Amino acid sequence: MIEGLHHIAILASKRAETLAFYEALGFVVTENHIRPERNDEIIFMEQAGTTLEVFISAGNPPRVSGPEAYGLWHVAFRVSDAAAVREVLIRSGYAPEDLRSDTFSGKAMFFVKDPDGLPIEIHE
């Protein structure tokens, strides 16, 4: 049976911008693989037991921004201080949404988009 989440796969077009974004969230590159036969690169990043598998590939269609399609909607990362993470992102040049309280838990949270428009939720 399922023991936990193994990794999150992200398809990205902007290598430097994508790495900088996830590094601002504390992720570090742990592996890098170039696949000439597929004309892409896979970069593994880790932070707090969470692994991102970032596929850098040009030529894919851009993410549909709305209306939301069925399937995976967003990725949510748990943090101890959402306001502090939001400030780090702002200082790093990103534009997170306003800090708000989760409707059900009352905990602080916000959304920000990665360089390819993937919604990322930061949640206490």
Which residues fall in each region the model found?
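Short secondary-structure capping/turn micro-motifs that flank functional sites
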Residues: 38-39, 55, 105-106
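Short, charged/polar surface micro-motifs in flexible loops or helix N-caps
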Residues: 48-52, 59-61, 82-83
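Vicinal oxygen chelate
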Residues: 4-14, 33, 42-44, 63-124
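A short, acidic/glycine-rich surface segment
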Residues: 30-32, 38-41, 59-65, 98
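Core segments of cupin and vicinal oxygen chelate
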Residues: 2, 10-51
